[in-house]
């Protein structure tokens, strides 16, 4: 998944990365992102290019460069090792050469990775949604921008600090599924997060802002 442009949390405006250099070829120096956010969401396969800060969700599917070895399958882009073809994640990672500028990786990138991972894990149920909003292994630009806009509009610092990130991630899963499903898709695991009054109120605000963002 490509790193979206960074947004100001207050104004929602796009910030430029003056110091970032875009890779002219395929990203090769990938850092396995480990922080409290990825730990809380159970995302051990999110990588960041140390040069251009592109984010790669290594799931042995779209955008992975897969090499078959005697021990199993390896993504040549990240060095992440899998004991079989399906993503049974192992704890074998390439050590980073140096620390990237992690501050430029917005929390929303991790939220998008969580939603992407959920959809891929349930791709038979949500195939129509995936086909409409994910192209070449990443969210289409207007969906990506709408998620950033919604997060900036709804989750102020005070709100964000009071709600677990896992809850916010699940709200975005429900938001995107509900916003792009062509018909009613009932999934008790998805709607469970909004059954409480506070989360239901947040989801209503998110739907309003997300809908506005898509038509801007």
From Swiss-Prot:
Pfam families given in the database record: Herpes_UL92 (PF03048)
Domain of life: Viruses
InterPro entries: Herpes_UL92
Family label: Belongs to the herpesviridae UL92 family.
Name this protein carries in UniProt: Protein U63
